[in-house]
Amino acid sequence: MSAAEGPLVVGVDTSTQSTKALVVDAATGRVVASGQAPHTVSSGTGRESDPRQWWDALGEALSQCGEAAREAAAVSVGGQQHGLVTLDARGEPVRPALLWNDVRSAPQARRLIDELGGAKAWAERTGSVPSASFTVTKWAWLTEHEPEAARAVKAVRLPHDYLTERLTGEGTTDRGDVSGTGWWASGTEAYDEEILARVALDPALLPRVVRPGEVAGTVRDGHGLPFSKGTLVAAGTGDNAAAALGLGLRPGVPVMSLGTSGTAYAVSQRRPADPTGTVAGFADARGDWLPLACTLNCTLAVDRVASLLGLDREAVEPGTDVTLLPFLDGERTPNLPHSSGLLHGLRHDTTAGQLLQAAYDGAVHSLLGALDLVLDADADPSAPLLLIGGGARGTAWQQTVRRLSGRPVQIPEARELVALGAAAQAAGLLTGEDAAAVARRWNTAAGPVLDAVERDEATLNRITGVLSDAAPLLERDAASR
């Protein structure tokens, strides 16, 4: 390992499946060491993890970083959003954490929306309309289904809060992650006491919300990790806000993340409040906002179509009027939760490669619809679209996004954007810089830029028309088919 030019910092990404740690040179952004360790998620009706696994995985990831981790002057944790971590008086988990993708609280979400004045009222108060992924609905589920466990709870945390507190001994969170709970009012930037009372959650059980740029605490003795006592600990944040930091996003720059599900977001200086619930009105980690919309069918759905056709995922062919809507898991944007995949326009001369291209087109059409919803009037329509996530490395994804968006497309070379964003936040504690400015200095968004091409309006209009004509069929639930 060559000598670092500046102090070292650690950025952590505790995701659903694993915890990753990067040791980064605060002066240059160079990653000098990295480590990763897995954790498990329950199967069956719920999705749960023991938070102590996250701590153990953090220790293992840091041990893989070697001596570099011991030299770190600051650390920050980014993590999966929405999870409900319940702790007893000793700081031990009362039960496994309910993760973001545990949707058993869907009935509680519907009831809470009705009880507090409907979707519009929720959006105006919290920036979002709560779904079963939100923490507030999970707490409501817990109090109904496991009342003894709920009574034993002495602290409620989010996943990144849990690791931060084990480092510092202090209960803290940040505005980016807490904005996904459903009990933080985005208008006042404070806990909403009426919502908390409605779900019987004592505000005293919640962590202090640390301001952007504020030190959350320092590493305490007895933690068993390679950090020295007194190492600075930043507030940390949720994974999407951390990735935005990792890209050094400026307001109005669009991001499209291609994973199992698709995500579109952009930093905005306007507080979002979408009464339809399609756009989540999250805060970012700096003082602005991070409106975000998701699609359910992205890389996994298109790969499934490729598999059914016996093709490699890159084996697309142009020149077809066929429309394929790959809604294999229902769809969120557009809001068609009961839909299934739909094929229209098949002809004798349609090839397998054209069918695969149609699947890409259908998935990207949904993502661009999501992107249109999150970009505000101040966004620059000519700004390059940042393409991240596993699918961003695929040529077929790149070219489809380019053709249907009509924008330049930039593919950042940096991969671990959540951990990089956390590292930038940690570096900002040392230098006094804004974390996004640190990432821009590190040039984390650098990567090839594909020039804009003429937007394929014919394909977009055709897919929009099929969606409209097929709406009665797509909106039916399975039982009525």
Swiss-Prot record:
A biological-process GO annotation: xylulose catabolic process
InterPro entries: ATPase_NBD, Carb_kinase_FGGY, Carb_kinase_FGGY_CS, FGGY_C, FGGY_Carb_Kinase, FGGY_N, Xylulokinase
Enzyme Commission code(s) on record: 2.7.1.17
Catalytic activity: D-xylulose + ATP = D-xylulose 5-phosphate + ADP + H(+)
Catalytic residues identified in the record: D239
SUPFAM superfamilies in the cross-refs: Actin-like ATPase domain (SSF53067)
One GO MF term: D-xylulokinase activity
Function: Catalyzes the phosphorylation of D-xylulose to D-xylulose 5-phosphate.
Protein name: Xylulose kinase
Source organism (scientific name): Streptomyces coelicolor (strain ATCC BAA-471 / A3(2) / M145)
Gene name per UniProt: xylB
